Amino acid sequence: MLEEIVVEGRQRSAAEQVLQERIELPVVADVVSAEQISRVGDSTVSLALRRLPAVTVVDGQYIYIRGLGERYSSTTLNGAQVPSPDLTRNVIPLDLFPAAIVETLKVQKGYSPDKPAAFGGGNVDVRTRSLPDRFVADIEVGTGWNSDSTGNGYTYPGGSDDRWGTDDGTRALPREITGAIDQYAGDITPTGILRALDRAGGFNTLADAEQVNRDIALNLNRNLDLRKQSLDPDINVEAALGNMWQVGEGGDWRVGGLAVVDYGDQWRNRERINRSATSPDVDFDVTERTIRQTTLTGSVAVGLDWAEEHQLQASWLYLRNTEDEASLTVGNNFNFQANTGSQLRNYRIRFEERELDVLQLSGRHKLGGATLDVLDFVPGVRNLEDLVFDWYYTDASADTDIPNEVQFSAVDRLDPDTGEFLSTSIRSSATAADYRFTELQDDVTSYGMKFEMPFETGDFLIVPSGGYDYYEKGRGYLQTQLGLGTTASAALPNLVGTPGQVFTDENITNASNGYVLSLGGIGTESYLAGETIDAAFGNVDVTWKETWRLSAGARWEDFARVSVPIDQYEYDTGVGIIRVPLEDIQNQAFAEDDFYPAAALTWMPGQLWADQFQLRFGWSETTARADLREISDATFIDPLTEARVRGNPNLVSSDLTNLDLRGEWFFGSGDNLTVSLFYKDITNPIETVEAPGSDDNIGLTFINAASADVYGLEVEWLKGLDFMSLGKWSDAFFVSGNVTISDSNLTIGSNALNLTNNERRLTQHAPWVINLQLGFDAPNERHSASLAYNAFDERVFFAGSNGAPDAYEQPFHSLDVVYSYYPIEQMALKLRAQNLLDEQIEIEQGGVTVLEQSVGIVFKFDVSYKF
């Protein structure tokens, strides 16, 4: 067996504590511990994962592994699949998980049959804190601030529960409006109301219907004027309490429990500049945004253990992550220019509450010595010695609520000669005020089991294993869009002012102003979807003389999915009934079943330039499937990008062939070196491409490209600086890091849709990624520090079409420092500074910076105490 690597030092040991698991795994994987995450000061899972080799983060939420996006990866929580609160993707955004709940993060880059077959870049398993083996009571309190957010920021009148990240009903769609939509059969325009009034009998005029329409509009929340206020510093509180008790005289029974709570509240100013690639001096805008992010996490786990052979555990996890945004955008286009005395002005508010609620039950049972003594009366039971049986059950739901997302469109009047601001007016438009109310509910039930039965024969250790997984998911997405405005010339004098000054009761109810409230959208924004996976797998792991190890097996999956657009305000069959024709379901359904094989070979010669050496080779065949909305033959407006997106029911799954070669050197001092080569061949990769849009929205759709491949080199290391012979101080320092150099090639083929480049790199693939860290552990264990650097090369942000070049996100160089002081063993003071280089996000297209967004320098201070 491989020897255990043991070293000392607060920070350096954190990296080495997870090495043993990585050594013993049959496939290529990387593991990061909670201590490592704490060392570099990352607050979420997504930020922590970017420190691993060949891992990058997009939009602060989505993980790209080896150049492949979230479509080609899967995320599990304690080994089980969970739902996603993401509005337009099937994958769970990893910024939802705070680092406070994490025990370890495992990124498996080599496929094994016990993992979902939807595997390309890798599988991320978020493993929550395990039950303690002794009494623990921890508390941590922190504060912080951002260099861009130390002054004033935008806000608006919200609800009384905003500090907890939930709305108290202030933003909810008023019952009076939903009642009116039902009463008038989904058409609340004056003509629709008039038809309903006529059906009810009596003499009614269009003027009567217009008045009813205006009365309905009065129920909208219009007290939304932006205002500036001083921003509070960051607040974060984290606490944990747990214990393990021995029960009974023999002490074989143990009962344990752990509870963790985490609360965070922060304000951030984000300035963003958008420019047209073709006319950046004419078509551009500047957005000042203030975002309040509130997080609330609670988890409880209880467990029972008998003789260290049988474990039962029940855990509950609740996550809430809310972003409350207020923004003001001012800009120009070809129709509104400062030299002609006008510019555009848009006010926007958006409150997005995301929740994840997970209940997990699991068990592990081993026929060890204590169990066999109890079952000795069963004939032949000892022939099953060391049989292990694992099982799990997960019931989870994810919800996203975006109430009262509002945008007011306005026009500023300027002095053409000086550019001096003169006045602002709400635009003369039927949708000058755009209201959206969005709800998403994702429900997942999954369960499974696995067994393994190790036995030895001669020089061979053989471990056959197998199991079953079931996954069922249902999703409902409902969006209501309302437009309020006027195009009446008589109303023009009353459009001058802010939204709160213009959309008053007096102005709306004045018939001469001609205000009209209408249902917006195109009828297919809402949808219902579901999918199921039945899976069975088997594997054999054979080790010969502790020198050669072969692990080979296969997974069978029966996959089915359907996604159907619905019009929740179609009243052909009555109020409250959503009609979905059987033909639509059949046309939108997709099903497939297949086998996915995998094999991994490891050579373990012992010492080869190191105390321990391993050489791994892996091969597998996997798949990547379209997201729920991508297969729906409907057009919808993406709530995040405002793009007009059309699904493609003709999409087929992508087939992947994966090859890995990795050499690992482990030294007795704890130093280690890893060198990996990887190659992936993808048939029918799914890509997002530009499609015909509208004057107000770009168009996007999805196609199967012809082929793609990804290949690269990863190098990872940990090295102490004791070789410098500078006494105890050189022993206190270490360097660690990783570098990934890779490339990819995507061939679109005949589905190019006028794309400028039929061949290019995969979207969001960075040719190089680098992580460097200099660590310090004081000999007296009172001080520790880390200087961490993360950077990536430019990556394709979106593909250009009709001759326009591709757009590239520019390199981002992140430099962070963390210092910890331990005045006593139980107490720690931690100071963190992030993005010390004050980098900003930039996207270039054809030499023009089409997007700039500030990030700011972050400073944080935490105090923790362990009782």
Question: Each predicted region: which residue ranges?
Answer:
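A beta-strand signature from Gram-negative outer-membrane beta-barrel systems
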Residues: 96-140, 866
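Short acidic/polar hinge/loop motifs at secondary-structure boundaries
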Residues: 51-53, 80-110, 129, 155
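Conserved C-terminal beta-signal and adjacent last beta-strands/turns
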Residues: 375, 432-440, 449-456, 461-465, ...
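Outer membrane beta-barrel strand-and-loop segments of large Gram-negative receptors
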Residues: 440, 447-450, 492-495, 499-503, ...
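Membrane-embedded beta-barrel scaffold of Gram-negative outer-membrane proteins
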Residues: 374-381, 386-394, 398-410, 464, ...
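Transmembrane beta-barrel wall of Gram-negative outer-membrane proteins
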Residues: 179-327, 355-359, 597-600, 604
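Gram-negative outer-membrane beta-barrel transporters
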Residues: 546-547, 672, 676-686, 697-798
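N-terminal periplasmic "start-of-domain" segments of outer-membrane beta-barrel proteins
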Residues: 6-38, 70-76, 80, 85
